[in-house]
C-alpha cells in the first residue's frame, strides 16, 4: 500500500488544516506555522512546528522564507523525513505557506530518491490582488524548482465551503494512496502511482461510480472526460497533452 511511503507537510493555516485531516487518517504529518493564533484553531493536532520569533507574517510571503531559514530545528526535521513520497500543502495566496513551500520542496528535493508533490490551494477571483500575486509567484517558483514531481492545484472556487473542498481533497488522495484493488484484466499498482506522482506537471483525480444515471457501465471515454470536468482542481488545458492516465 502506497500510504506507508507517504508523509504530509502542512504550511500555514490552510495547509495545516488539510494536513490535520490526513493526521486523523494516521499519516505522518508535520504542521508548520508562525502564528500562535492560527495554531490554536487546530485543537488536538500533534507535531505542530512553530516558527519561533514570528507570530504571523502579515500577508508578506517574502518574510516566510526568512522565518523558515532561521528555524534550523524545523529544517533539520524536514530533511530527516524517512518516507519516500512527501506531499507539501500550502495556500497559494497566503504568506507562511506560499513563502515557505518552495524552500521546503527544495530541501526535500536534495534527496534524489524522494518524490515531492506540492499541493497549492489557489485563491478565488474575488480575493485581494496580493493573494493572487502570491499564488502566481509561488506557482512560478515551484515550476522552476528542480526535482519536484507532480503539482496539485486546488480551485477554492469549486465549492462555497472550503471545508467541503478540503474534505474532498483528503478523501480523493487517501483513496489514491490506499487503494489496492486488483483484477485479472489489469492492475494499477503502487509503482505506477509513484511514477505519476514523480512526473512533473499538473495532477488531477476523478472519481466515478460503477454505473451512470442511465444504469450503463462507465466507459473509458466517460473517465477521461471526467478529468476535465468541473471538480476541486483548477481546470487543465483540454489540448490532449497528457503524460499518464491511471484508471
Question: Language-model features: where?
Answer:
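Tubulin/FtsZ superfamily GTPase core signature
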Residues: 1-247
Amino acid at each position: 500500500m502506497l500510504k506507508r511511503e507517504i508523509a504530509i507537510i502542512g504550511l500555514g493555516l490552510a495547509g495545516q488544516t488539510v494536513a490535520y485531516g490526513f493526521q486523523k487518517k494516521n499519516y505522518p504529518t508535520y504542521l508548520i506555522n508562525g502564528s500562535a493564533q492560527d495554531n490554536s484553531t487546530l485543537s488536538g493536532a500533534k507535531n505542530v512546528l512553530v516558527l519561533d520569533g514570528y507570530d504571523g507574517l502579515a500577508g508578506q510571503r517574502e518574510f516566510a522564507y526568512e522565518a523558515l531559514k532561521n528555524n534550523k530545528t524545523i529544517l533539520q526535521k524536514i530533511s530527516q523525513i524517512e518516507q519516500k513520497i512527501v506531499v507539501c500543502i500550502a495556500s497559494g495566496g497566503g504568506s507562511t505557506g506560499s513563502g515557505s513551500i518552495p524552500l521546503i520542496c527544495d530541501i526535500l528535493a536534495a534527496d534524489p530518491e524522494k518524490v515531492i508533490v506540492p499541493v497549492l490551494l489557489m485563491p478565488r477571483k474575488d480575493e485581494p490582488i496580493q493573494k493572487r500575486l502570491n499564488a502566481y509567484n509561488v506557482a512560478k517558483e515551484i515550476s522552476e524548482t528542480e526535482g519536484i514531481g507532480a503539482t496539485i492545484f486546488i480551485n477554492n472556487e469549486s465549492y462555497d465551503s472550503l471545508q467541503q473542498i478540503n474534505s474532498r481533497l483528503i478523501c480523493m488522495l487517501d483513496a489514491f494512496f490506499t487503494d489496492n484493488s486488483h483484477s485479472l484484466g489489469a492492475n494499477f499498482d503502487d509503482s505506477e502511482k509513484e511514477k505519476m506522482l514523480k512526473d512533473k506537471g499538473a495532477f488531477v483525480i476523478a472519481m466515478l461510480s460503477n454505473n451512470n444515471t442511465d444504469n450503463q457501465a462507465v466507459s473509458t471515454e466517460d473517465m477521461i472526460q471526467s478529468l476535465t470536468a468541473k471538480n476541486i482542481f483548477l481546470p487543465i488545458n483540454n489540448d490532449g497533452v497528457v503524460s499518464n492516465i491511471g484508471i
